[in-house]
């Protein structure tokens, strides 16, 4: 399982046999350019579908070790074959998120998402994904303090058994 530090899960999750990712993403050239954008040597991308929507991996659960090995070997081979370029971030995002979806589609491995891509910005209470809000909170201490207070209140309300951790953090920060 993989969890980004900007993704908060506020409920217990059920795990089964399918891959679980945060959500699907639209294919846009500025984030997910066409395959001919990538300059690679000695690596041929298998006959993957270019139309399958990428999987955001802010949360990722992969229960099948055979699939995990297939996907990671494809992603690593792709990154190792990357020719010097100006934008390795696009290569990394392709290898991590788009290739994951392509591999799942290719192997017919079932995929489930925690959030629906078409309702990402609608209110819901199960997950918090900070995305661009991270920079806003870095730049604005009042915004950051407000977010921290809301998280503490949520933890105290929904997970009172962990309230002691908040108290320990307060105590440690006062030393």
Question: Model regions: which residues?
Answer:
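Glycosyltransferase catalytic domains, chiefly GT-A lineage
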Residues: 1-175
């Amino acid at each position: 399982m993989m969890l980004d530090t900007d993704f908060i899960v506020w409920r217990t999750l059920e795990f089964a046999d399918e891959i679980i990712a945060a959500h699907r993403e639209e294919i846009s050239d500025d984030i997910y350019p066409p395959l001919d954008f990538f300059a690679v040597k000695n690596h041929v991308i298998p006959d993957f579908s270019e139309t399958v929507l990428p999987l955001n991996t802010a949360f990722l659960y992969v229960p099948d070790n055979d699939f995990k090995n297939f996907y990671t070997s494809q992603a690593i081979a792709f990154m190792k074959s990357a020719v010097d370029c100006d934008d390795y971030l696009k290569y990394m995002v392709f290898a991590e998120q788009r290739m994951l979806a392509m591999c799942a589609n290719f192997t017919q491995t079932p995929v489930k998402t925690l959030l629906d891509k078409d309702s990402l910005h609608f209110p819901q209470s199960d997950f918090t994904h900070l995305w661009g809000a991270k920079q806003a909170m870095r730049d604005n201490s009042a915004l950051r303090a407000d977010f921290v207070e809301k998280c503490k209140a949520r933890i105290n309300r929904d997970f009172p058994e962990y309230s002691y951790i908040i108290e320990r953090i307060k105590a440690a920060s006062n030393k």
